[in-house]
Each structure stands twice: as structure tokens, then as C-alpha cells.
A protein has these predicted regions:
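Secondary-structure junction/capping motif
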Residues: 2-4, 25, 127, 290-292, ...
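An amphipathic, basic-hydrophobic helix/alpha-beta surface used to engage anionic
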Residues: 28, 37-325, 369-373, 387
Length: 451
């Protein structure tokens, strides 16, 4: 539209100039001056329309979680000497979600105002600002309910403006792109029993360590390299020489979470569509997508959160688009790393869970527990668990009932056979509350709640 208008004015200018030269009449010259002046004025106006205009984006964090609200504050400043008639902000973010509770609109000469965001799905930063005076600024807050895990781009954003006649438009890049990672949601688990380590014959797993742990098992004389935190002061005072504490590796076993990310075992309804409600979303109404991939990742995230919060050492294995292996460790950094890995995990793997176990089984220490999360109903999974048991690793199955997700039947029968063999099994169906099932009780829940 802008180009066509400018071309129309240019054609009119050319015709009037040609008519004036051909006839010598002043009317044609006057019209030529008018159209020419309009073109020059509009061009100069458009060129200066974005002079001194700056857009800033301020995010509180580079990470969010499914169900939480991501907030981004935007500041549009006019540092130029001339007022701006209008400025359009165009954003190219890929963050899905739904707008939530923006502030009221308003702009005053003394204090910044708050512009109102559109009630549209997705992270909506794009807007049109009218009448931005010299030296003034406009602030507004974009709040988006995160509904999908993953790594998303925020920006880049560009500014557009033009002349009041709509003949010319100009644009410039305003902010570079940066990324936001949306972590999977975690559902609270009431109880999830993991056995202590064992040796052949049923003995507990005991091993001395040079590291300071919660298990002090005795004292010994000081050796070069021992830290001050190891000194047992009462024994030192009694024996009149430095005595240090000896520690033992925590008898709690390592727990390895193995997620089946094979593309061949995933199920989802054929008519699955984005069915989240539009508009303002209460936190409790963010639903888990009805796919085995999302339920499996939610189960893995919930287990990791539960076990790590109880000082367990947790590792993660998943063969998706790429191979993910996180060594077993404790603490908040390990939880963050596991959740970030699960956030970007895609079920495009080519190896089934039984093949992954055959490859990774030597990695598991003796006495560890392997939690296998899969929607694969094949009997080969039981053969893989036998391989783990031969290595003194305790397997536990978290089966996703593929039939309830629109896939092939067989998960319920596999769960029954595994239970008869003495394996601990949890069967998750579409609509179940994941935390309740992992705790030992299945309960249908229409809406997914975030811990």
C-alpha cells in the first residue's frame, strides 16, 4: 500500500510537470510543485520518524516452568527532539502461551504509562504506539502463561514508522534475539520407595570415602590433606593430637531415570489440537498434552524433583534426537540440569528402550535402581530388565498405557506380567494425575496442576 501511494504521487508529479512543459500553463507547474513537495516532505519525515527511538526488553529470568507466568517489561523511549506520530513494534518471538493480566493503559507527561497487551495466544509484544512526545517513554508489561516446554526465541524486535500521509515507511532492528527455556512441570509425589544398596547375600553397601558426607562412621589420626572441617575436636582434646572423622558413602543407592525417547513407541491422538482456553488462565488450568512423550517427560521430571529433594543421587539417560547422559549426582544444580535436558528432549530417537539398556547397562553401579519410563508394550523390555538384575541393578517400570493415548494395546498386560515377576510397576493412563500414580494410586484428573 505504501509503495503504491508513493508511485501514484510520483506519476501525478510527472504528469503535471510534463503538462506544464508542454502547455506552459501555471496550473500544471503549481500542481507539480505540490506533488513534488509532498514527496520530499514525506520522505524526510519518514527518514527521521525513528531517529532517537529506542526499545528495551527486560526479562526477570531466562528460564520458566510450564504453568508459570513469564514476565517481560518493555520500554520505548523517544530521545529525539521531535515527537513521533506513530511507532509500530514488530516482534518475532516463538514462545507459545496465553496472555495473562496486563496492566491498565495510560501515559502521562511526568511518569511512564502502561500499555495494554492484546488478548491473543502466544507471547504478544507487537503493538502500535501513537503520539510519543520528545523525551518521553512508554512502559508496559507482557505476561505470558507458559503452556509448553522447550527452548524458545524471544525477539528479535523491529520498529516501523512513516510519514503522516502513508507514502513511505522505514524500519530498523530494535533488539536482538535471546532465548527462554521453559522447564517441564513437576507434580508432587507423596511417596516413592527406593531400596538401599545391597551386595550379594543381602548385605548393605558400605564404602569409605575421602569426601565429607552425612555418614560419619569413626575417627582416625590426621593425615596431610585433611580439611579442618573433618577434625573431631573432642577426640583431639582427649588424645592431645589431631583426630579427624571418617566418612562413608551414603548407603542410599543411585537412581537412574531412563526415558524412552524413541519415535517408534510414542502415541498421540490423531486429531490432537491446541485446546488450551484463550484469555486469562488460572495456574491450575494448564493441561498436560495427551501424548505419551509429554506424560513420560512429566513423570521423569516429577521423579527427579522428588528424589533430589530427598538427597538422592539421580542420573538421567535418554536417546532422543541426540544422546543425553547425565551422571548421577545430588543437589539443586543436578535438578536444574535434568529439567533443562528434559525441556529440550524430543522423541525422535531410533533406538528402543531395550537397546538403550543393553548399551548403557555397564554404566549403572552395582546396587543402583533404574526407573524405566516407556510406552513400549513389547516383551523385549522384560528381557532387558533381566539383564539389569544380572548386574545387581534393581529395575522399576513406569509404563505409559499407549492404548489410552490412541496407540496400540498391550501395556496393561505387560504391567501384569512384570508384577508377577516381582518387578515394581506403575501404569499411567491418559488423564491420570502423574504424581498420584507414581505414589501408588491412579486418579483421573482433567486439568494438570503444577507443583
Amino acid at each position: 500500500m505504501t509503495r503504491s501511494r508513493a508511485w501514484v504521487v510520483l506519476v501525478l508529479f510527472s504528469l503535471c510537470l510534463f503538462g506544464g512543459l508542454a502547455t506552459g500553463r501555471e496550473l500544471f507547474y503549481s500542481l507539480a510543485y505540490l506533488w513534488g513537495g509532498l514527496l520530499i516532505t514525506s520522505f524526510v519525515w519518514a527518514r527521521s520518524a525513528l531517529s532517537g527511538v529506542i526499545l528495551e526488553r527486560q526479562a526477570r529470568s531466562t528460564a520458566a516452568q510450564v504453568g508459570s507466568v513469564f514476565e517481560e517489561r518493555l520500554i520505548l523511549r523517544n530521545q529525539g527532539r521531535l515527537p513521533k506520530l506513530w511507532v509500530e513494534i514488530r516482534d518475532h518471538s516463538t514462545l507459545p502461551g496465553y496472555w495473562a493480566t496486563p496492566g491498565p493503559a495510560g501515559l502521562t507527561a511526568d511518569e511512564p504509562g502502561t500499555a495494554r497487551a492484546a488478548d491473543l495466544p502466544g507471547h504478544r509484544v507487537s503493538s502500535v504506539i501513537a503520539g510519543l512526545g520528545s523525551g518521553r517513554e512508554l512502559r508496559w508489561l507482557v505476561r505470558t502463561r507458559c503452556t509448553r516446554r522447550g527452548r524458545f526465541r524471544l525477539g528479535p524486535a523491529s520498529l516501523e514508522s512513516g510519514d503522516p500521509f502513508g507514502l513511505f515507511r522505514i524500519s530498523k532492528d530494535a533488539t536482538p534475539a535471546h532465548h527462554l527455556i521453559v522447564l517441564p512441570s513437576t507434580d508432587p509425589i507423596a511417596e516413592f520407595t527406593v531400596p538401599s544398596g545391597y551386595l550379594p547375600g543381602g548385605g548393605a553397601l558400605h564404602q569409605r570415602t575421602n569426601q565429607v558426607t552425612a555418614n560419619a562412621v569413626g575417627v582416625r589420626e590426621y593425615a596431610p590433606g585433611d580439611g579442618l572441617s573433618r577434625i573431631h575436636w573432642r577426640s583431639t582434646a582427649r588424645r592431645e593430637r589431631l583426630i579427624v572423622k571418617e566418612f562413608e558413602i551414603d548407603p542410599k543407592v543411585d537412581v537412574w531415570i531412563v526415558v524412552d525417547a524413541s519415535s517408534m513407541t510414542q502415541s498421540r491422538p490423531p486429531d490432537l489440537a491446541e485446546d488450551q482456553p484463550r484469555g486469562i488462565l488460572p495456574r491450575s488450568e494448564v493441561r498436560l498434552p495427551p501424548t505419551t512423550e509429554e506424560y513420560g517427560i512429566a513423570a521423569a521430571a516429577s521423579l527427579a524433583f522428588h528424589l533430589l529433594s530427598r538427597d538422592r543421587a539421580v542420573g538421567l539417560i535418554a536417546y532422543g534426537r541426540v544422546r543425553h547422559v547425565l551422571q548421577a549426582n545430588r543437589g539443586q544444580p543436578q535438578l536444574n540440569q535434568i529439567l533443562e535436558t528434559l525441556a529440550t528432549l524430543e522423541a525422535f530417537g531410533r533406538l528402543g528402550l531395550d537397546e538403550v539398556i543393553r548399551i548403557e547397562a555397564p554404566r549403572f553401579p552395582r546396587g543402583a535402581t533404574a526407573v524405566l519410563i516407556t510406552a513400549d508394550p513389547r516383551q523385549s523390555l522384560l528381557v532387558a530388565t533381566q539383564e539389569l538384575e544380572r548386574r545387581r541393578v534393581s529395575p522399576m517400570l513406569v509404563l505409559l498405557d499407549a492404548e489410552s493415548f490412541g496407540g496400540v494395546p498391550g501395556s496393561a498386560a505387560l504391567a501384569e506380567r512384570a508384577s508377577r515377576r516381582g518387578l515394581r510397576v506403575r501404569l499411567i493412563r491418559c488423564g491420570d494425575r502423574v504424581g498420584n500414580v507414581l505414589s501408588g494410586a491412579a486418579q483421573p484428573l482433567p486439568a494438570w496442576k503444577v507443583a
